[in-house]
């Protein structure tokens, strides 16, 4: 019978015997080859989120549209985003060990990560279900949408464990350079969600409850698929159910790198909760417009986040392999490509704002408010690029605390100060959303200065 040591040796030999293009191939090609599956995967993830909004908005009403977005989306992001941030520590650790061909350590990281997903899923389910009404009231959710919003968020958190397992499993696959299969799983999940949305919301008239049920069932499917692939692989990241447990030292390493990213996500979302509360105070029409904008706006975030994930894995594997020149070239290349993509998307969204909004609602007042928001924010997208790419780069080398502090001060604290001081002087949607480009600009400048002058990858003053 084959021993664990023999299995590890064979897995290592499998990796050594094949060329790892991420550390040897043409940089821009490798970034794009990794980027596109992540982009399309994120697109389908956003598509099934948008499907809820489109179907309930068109077939149930603007109150239902507000219920499945707005405050519920922000609260979901608060908890799920914290976990995804923590799980980024696993992605970084696995990518570095995989780049260094350390099979045993990859195995410890994989099984600890899945164990963490299971425990976190149970905890998040309990918190989400019990705290939902209180949290929605705290955010000044309008009374006419409080009931359906509570229903949606409670059903969502009852099935949240599928989301967490998928995100962790997809992160493991991306860490070893496989960004295609997470895409395939999301396509299957998205199509399932759309079919179930139509069946539950339109066919069975289940309203927001049907939309939530469709979402958690489709997420469960993606979780099953990603676990199936991890269990069938012959590579060093193979998952064996009997080995799923916490390794204390590995868990500490994962949390040490992932906790800053998790806290960063919480701080982002906490400041967004304050913003959402300010938006809620402007009425249901503005909440509906903001909800629809968040779905349109997701086009930008899925592009920039896909580049952020790509550069994290690229940097992690090349840093693990000791190829520092490729790290620096990769950062420059990724920044340039992201800038081009951002400008192109901004032009398209700005010029087709009305068409975008009419996908979600035909209410003239909601569309008018939404176009005003979009025309103000879209031209400022470019100010965020450096935050995503440089924070992803620094996470790739395990430097995550300083980026968290930069984001805390530059984004969260400054955003809160703006909302508490400027909005009372002029309580208007543009005053509220101005907090985004203001904080993006300040934080981007701080990231550039840290990366060039003070980080482990610093360019200025670096010994040659």
Residue spans for each PLM region:
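Short alpha-helical transmembrane segments in multi-pass integral membrane proteins
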Residues: 1-35, 94-159, 203-259, 315-380, ...
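Small-residue-rich hydrophobic transmembrane alpha-helices
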Residues: 65-126, 163-182, 289-353, 384-407, ...
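Short runs within selected transmembrane alpha-helices of multi-pass transporters and secretion channels
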Residues: 87, 155-174, 182-190, 211-226, ...
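Alpha-helical transmembrane segments and their lipid-water interface positions
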Residues: 45, 49-56, 80-87, 91, ...
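Residue-level signal for short hydrophobic patches within transmembrane helices
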Residues: 24, 28-47, 51, 75-82, ...
């Amino acid at each position: 019978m084959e021993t664990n040591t023999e299995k590890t040796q064979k897995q290592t030999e499998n990796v050594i015997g094949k060329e790892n293009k991420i550390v040897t191939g043409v940089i821009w090609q490798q970034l794009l080859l990794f980027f596109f599956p992540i982009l399309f995967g994120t697109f389908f993830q956003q598509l099934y989120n948008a499907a809820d909004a489109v179907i309930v908005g068109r077939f149930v009403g603007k109150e239902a549209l507000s219920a499945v977005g707005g405050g519920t989306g922000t609260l979901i992001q608060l908890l799920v985003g914290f976990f995804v941030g923590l799980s980024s520590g696993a992605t970084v650790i696995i990518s570095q060990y995989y780049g260094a061909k350390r099979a045993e350590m990859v195995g410890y990281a994989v099984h600890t990560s899945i164990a963490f997903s299971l425990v976190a899923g149970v905890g998040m389910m309990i918190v989400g279900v019990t705290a939902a009404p209180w949290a929605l009231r705290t955010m000044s959710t309008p009374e006419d949408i409080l009931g359906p919003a509570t229903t949606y968020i409670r059903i969502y958190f009852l099935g949240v464990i599928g989301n967490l397992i998928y995100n962790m499993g997809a992160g493991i696959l991306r860490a070893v350079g496989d960004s295609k299969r997470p895409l395939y799983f999301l396509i299957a999940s998205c199509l399932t969600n759309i079919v179930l949305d139509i069946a539950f919301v339109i066919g069975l008239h289940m309203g927001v409850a049907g939309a939530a049920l469709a979402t958690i069932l489709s997420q469960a499917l993606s979780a099953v698929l990603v676990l199936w692939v991890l269990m069938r692989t012959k590579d060093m990241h193979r998952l064996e159910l009997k080995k799923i447990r916490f390794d204390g030292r590995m868990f500490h390493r994962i949390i040490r790198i992932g906790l800053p990213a998790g806290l960063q996500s919480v701080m982002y979302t906490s400041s967004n909760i304050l913003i959402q509360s300010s938006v809620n105070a402007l009425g249901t029409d503005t909440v509906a417009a903001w909800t629809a904008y968040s779905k349109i706006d997701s086009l930008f975030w899925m592009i920039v986040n896909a580049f952020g994930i790509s550069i994290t894995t690229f940097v992690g594997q090349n840093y693990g392999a000791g190829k520092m020149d490729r790290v620096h070239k990769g950062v420059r290349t990724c920044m340039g490509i992201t800038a081009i993509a951002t400008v192109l998307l901004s032009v398209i969204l700005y010029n087709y704002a009305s068409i975008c909004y009419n996908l979600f609602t035909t209410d003239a007042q909601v569309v008018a408010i939404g176009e005003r928001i979009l025309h103000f924010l879209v031209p400022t997208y470019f100010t965020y690029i450096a935050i995503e790419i440089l924070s992803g780069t620094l996470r790739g080398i395990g430097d995550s605390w300083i980026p968290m502090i930069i984001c805390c001060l530059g984004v969260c604290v400054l955003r809160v100060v703006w909302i508490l001081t400027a909005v009372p002087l002029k309580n208007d949607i543009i005053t509220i959303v101005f907090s985004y480009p203001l904080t993006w600009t300040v934080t981007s400048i701080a990231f550039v200065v840290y990366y060039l002058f003070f980080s482990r990858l610093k360019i200025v003053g670096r010994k040659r």
